Each structure stands twice: as C-alpha cells, then as structure tokens.
Design a protein with these regions (language model features):
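Single conserved hydrophobic/aromatic residue that forms the stacking wall/gate
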Residues: 1-12
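Pseudouridine synthases involved in rRNA/tRNA modification
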Residues: 92-106, 110, 133, 141-221
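Glycine- and acidic-residue-rich catalytic/RNA-contacting loop of pseudouridine synthases
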Residues: 6, 38-40, 58-126, 142
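Residue-level signal for inorganic ion chemistry
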Residues: 30, 56, 116, 140, ...
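A generic structural signal for short beta-strands and their flanking turns/coil linkers
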Residues: 50-54, 68, 112-114, 126, ...
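Short, solvent-exposed secondary-structure boundary/capping segments
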Residues: 124-130, 203
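Glycine/acidic-rich beta-strand-loop module
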Residues: 13-46, 139
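Short phosphate-engaging motifs
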Residues: 37, 64, 136, 198-199
Length: 221
C-alpha cells in the first residue's frame, strides 16, 4: 500500500530511525537521540562503515564459514527478490532466461555479499550468525534459500513442509531471523540483544541448546 508506506516513512523520519527490518524480523533498530547523532548514524548505514550481524535458524546442516556473493533483482509488483550467481552480462545473454526479462536494465541487478558461520546444528537445522555486508531487501532470506538453506518459518522464500514442521511443533508463524548485533567502531558503539525466547525454544526442542551459545555468538565476527 503506497499510502501506508509513505506514512511509515514519515514515522521513521520523525523518530530518528536509521534502519528498517523486514516484516516479522525481530531485533535491533537504530535511532539517533539527537539530530547530530541521527546524522552520524545514518551516514554509517549509508556508507556501510558499520557491521550488522543477524542470527537465524535454517534448514539443513552447515559445517563451515562461508562468504557468498551474487546479484539480487527485486520484483516490486510482488515484493519478492530473485538471487543470481552470475554477473548481469552473463544473465542477460543467457538463452534460458525468460523473454520478458531479457531487456531488463542491468542496474536492477544489485550486487550482494553475505557471510555466515554455523554455531550449532543437528543435521536437520543449523543456527547461523550472519554478517550482512550488503543490506538489500530480503537479502538474507533469499540468499540462503538460493543455497538450499531456507529460513525456518519463511513463507515467502522457505520450504513448505519445513515451515509446517515448525508451525506444528513450535507454533512458529514468522521467519526465524533476528537482528542480533551492531558494531560501529568509529563511534565506539557495540550493541547486541539477547537470543529470542523463540530461538531458545526451538534449539532446546531440537536438543542442541547449550548454555555457552550466547558467549559463542558474542565472540564470532
């Protein structure tokens, strides 16, 4: 709804909020208490001179740290993004690409970079800490889904049977994605949240919760 979007945008501006989260994503939202603080914070978000970390629960087992790159293209008509591994030139010359996409402006393919490290896994699921290097719309959700590791509870990019399992067993209705930590070295700012109770409930239910996980998450960068 364009009118609602404009209204929400006005609210964000009035409250001095610098970043937005995907709908149903929990966690840290940064805001400036003063105009000077807001300007400094906003500049760091714009210039990407800060580090943003998320935690999420995904399908399958991930055993090692990965830095993955690609390109993201958003379809505004349905508020959904598609991830491509290839460069735009390669995509636009691909014979298998849908005809209605062949004349798409290359600038619509935005470069993305996502780093993730596994914290704990039982083979069925993995708890990840994500370093969101670029901050595109739906980036974490779509990028991991494209790698066959969709987020639990993600009804836009996820796996239907996997989501149903979490809905039935853990009453999970939203994607298990949480903005966990922000680090701004230039401003000597480092903040992180507690692990959400919904995450702990799942990890305990899957018998992989360990008391030392909060300390592990804090140490991983």
């Amino acid at each position: 709804d364009p009118e609602m979007s404009r209204g929400l945008g006005d609210v964000y501006k009035r409250q001095g909020i610098c970043n937005r989260l995907d709908r149903n994503t929990s966690g840290i939202v940064a805001a400036g208490k003063t105009m000077n603080g807001l300007q400094k914070l906003s500049a760091h978000f714009k210039d990407r001179t800060l580090n943003k970390y998320y935690i999420c629960i995904v399908k399958g087992e991930i055993t090692k740290r990965q830095l993955v790159n690609g390109y993201l293209k958003k379809d505004h008509s349905c508020n959904r993004v598609t991830i491509y591994k290839q460069l735009p030139d390669d995509i636009l010359s691909d014979k298998n690409m849908p005809a209605n996409d062949k004349n798409t402006d290359k600038s619509e393919y935005m470069p993305i970079e996502t780093e993730y490290v596994p914290v704990v896994s039982n083979g069925r699921i993995t708890l990840l800490k994500i370093h969101l290097i670029t901050g595109r719309s739906h980036q974490i959700r779509a990028h991991l889904a494209s790698l066959s590791h969709p987020l639990a509870g993600d009804y836009k990019y996820g796996d239907a049977s996997f989501n149903q399992y979490f809905a039935d067993k853990y009453f999970c209705r939203n994607q298990m994605l949480h903005s966990y930590e922000i680090d701004i070295p230039d401003m000597n700012i480092h903040v992180h949240t507690d692990i959400p109770a919904s995450f702990i409930n799942v990890l305990k239910g899957e018998q992989i919760w360990q008391p030392g996980i909060p300390e592990v998450l804090e140490a991983l960068h």
